[in-house]
Amino acid sequence: LATGVAATTLLGGSILVSAADDGGNTAQARTLDEIKEDGKIKIGVFSDKNPFGYVDENGDVQGYDVYFGKRLAKDLLGSEDDVEFTYVESASRVEYLQSAKVDVILANFTVTDDRAEKVDFALPYMKVALGVVSPDDALIKDVKDLEGKKLIVVKGTTAETYFTDNYPDIELVKFDEYQEAYDALLDG
């Protein structure tokens, strides 16, 4: 841990409800009537971002986003069981909507101008905070403290975009999944 590695964390998000292709056209998302006719709503969630979306020791998906998704299913279709969860990674959220693999994303997705050009967002369901996690013996209290250190980020996140755009001299170590990023932080 003393190697100067830190990790970013982002808490927050909005519901993604439809997508647009690269030309800006709305993709063929299922309509509410089609979802009701099918009897299931397909929702994308994280599998490794406790407490939001994660797989427990019994192999069951859990978390706040999962709870919220079950409530959506109950309100729309009559039962919390009328939901099919699909695991997504940060970088795959838009693609899963565009390809109709899911109807909705509940996976801590911050609204940005770039993302808003590709998908439609509902109102946010939690507040967002960007932070840095660091070892006790190498505390990061200010972005200046990151100079000369490696910063772990998850691909496709607001943290990756923020540091790439605003601090290009900070070396980013990028991972696909939150668990991989966490393990890398622990491994130093």
Where are these regions (language model features)?
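Short, low-complexity disordered leader/linker segments with a strong preference
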Residues: L1-D38
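Short, structurally constrained coil/turn elements
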Residues: G13, E37, L77-S79, R115, ...
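Surface-exposed loop/turn and secondary-structure junction residues enriched for glycine/proline
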Residues: A19, I35-D38, V55-N58, Y64, ...
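Extracytoplasmic small-molecule ligand-binding "clamshell" domains
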Residues: T26-L106
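Bilobed "Venus flytrap"/periplasmic-binding protein-like clamshell domains
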Residues: V45-P51, V61-L76, T110, K127-D183
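Short, glycine/charged-enriched secondary-structure capping and boundary segments
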Residues: D56-D60, A100, V119-A122, E147, ...
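Acidic, polar ligand-binding/catalytic clefts
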Residues: K70, D82-D145
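Conserved functional loop/turn residues at catalytic and ligand-binding sites
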Residues: K101, K150, G188
